[in-house]
């Protein structure tokens, strides 16, 4: 069996258990949902060959109904070229990142373009939504939804991110 399938099952079990813990009312069901959540963390620990005490706080640290993490990206064009920035891992991507609490997707995209490329931008419209797990294996421990916004360049001068 492929590791990615086991990871997908562990993530789904964790999300289902977390929903059960959030909505459950019966003490016995709560115990069962907690055990399922613990088992999902144990599965992830085995899959990733990581100590359980490191996995559990990251994988089981959220309360409430599990929802995807939101990532925003700025698509900035100059003539027929698109701006890419280099990540720490050496790969290239559109400027962007996790949407910070308290910011809208548009506000976050403006912030990320400034931080990662030194550019002031104005988001014009959403041009794509992406389920990262569906389009970019391997699967992550959390579902990720990427929002791509077409942006107009307002000013600034390109600064490579560090």
Model-derived regions: residue spans:
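Long alpha-helical scaffolds
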Residues: 10, 17, 33, 37-40, ...
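Unchanged
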Residues: 99-123, 131-162
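Acidic, metal-coordinating catalytic segment for phosphate/diphosphate chemistry
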Residues: 27-73
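Secondary-structure edge/capping motif, primarily at the C-terminal ends of alpha-helices
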Residues: 17-24
């Amino acid at each position: 069996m492929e590791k990615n399938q086991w990871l997908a099952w562990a993530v789904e079990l964790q999300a289902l258990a977390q929903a059960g813990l959030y909505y459950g009312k019966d003490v016995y069901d709560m115990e069962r949902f907690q055990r399922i959540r613990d088992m999902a963390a144990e599965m992830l620990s085995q899959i990733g060959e990581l100590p359980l005490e490191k996995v559990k706080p990251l994988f089981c640290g959220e309360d409430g109904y599990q929802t995807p993490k939101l990532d925003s990206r700025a698509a900035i064009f100059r003539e027929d070229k698109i701006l890419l920035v280099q990540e720490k891992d050496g790969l290239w991507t559109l400027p962007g990142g996790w949407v910070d609490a308290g910011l809208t997707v548009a506000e976050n995209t403006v912030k990320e373009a400034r931080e990662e490329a030194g550019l002031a931008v104005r988001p014009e419209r959403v041009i794509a939504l992406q389920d990262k797990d569906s389009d970019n294996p391997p699967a992550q421990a959390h579902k990720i939804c990427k929002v791509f916004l077409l942006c107009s360049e307002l000013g600034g001068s390109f600064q490579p991110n560090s």
